[in-house]
Amino acid sequence: MLFLDEFPEFQPAALDSLRQPMESGDVTIVRANYRVTFPARFMLVGAMNPCRCGKAGDPGFSCRRGANERCAAEYQGRLSGPLLDRIDLHIEVPAVSAADLILPAPAEGSREVAARVARARDAQAKRYAALGMPGIRTNAQAHGPALEEVAKLDNAGLALIRDAADAMRLSARGYHRVLRVARTLADLDVAEKIGRVHLSEALSYRALADEARRAA
């Protein structure tokens, strides 16, 4: 797990250096006449404010740096499109108010969620083993033919992702990442096939990235 807080505050070159290991799961160091490749498979979690002052989108707030939209666009524009394209889940988390703190706990607690994730991972490992792919244990490791084998869509799903690909300008990488997330959501629901609801949710997690690219 690699957690980067205040994501856009890192140097753009440093952030973009993560692109290759995020894609391949390894990193190659070249020095003089030597070239060495190390394993570097990790899960990246980045957290950021919507803008430098952190108030963009708040009702009744006027940014001292100018228009709220401009402040947010400039700040979020520090993240390159190719980097954003490699992040599968883009989630907006609203500020927590004092009133939120006294609300009852969610119906599904952390322990229940962890158990559901463990069951999904176990199901994935068994699926790939049954397909003769023992080197793959999770959907995150599935690429190309392996992913296409386990993430087949019905006609309704194909129509949905075709329309979304045009509207959201999905890259080939983005398309495959949506399939991977949809397959995982189906596994969490103990569903044999990817349903429209799983595909729709997977696409929704890329909507914020699409907005950021348009703003930039």
Question: What is each model feature region?
Answer:
Residues 2-6:
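Walker B beta-strand of ABC/ABC-like P-loop ATPase nucleotide-binding domains
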Residues 7, 13-215:
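Basic, amphipathic alpha-helical bundle interface domains used for macromolecular binding and assembly
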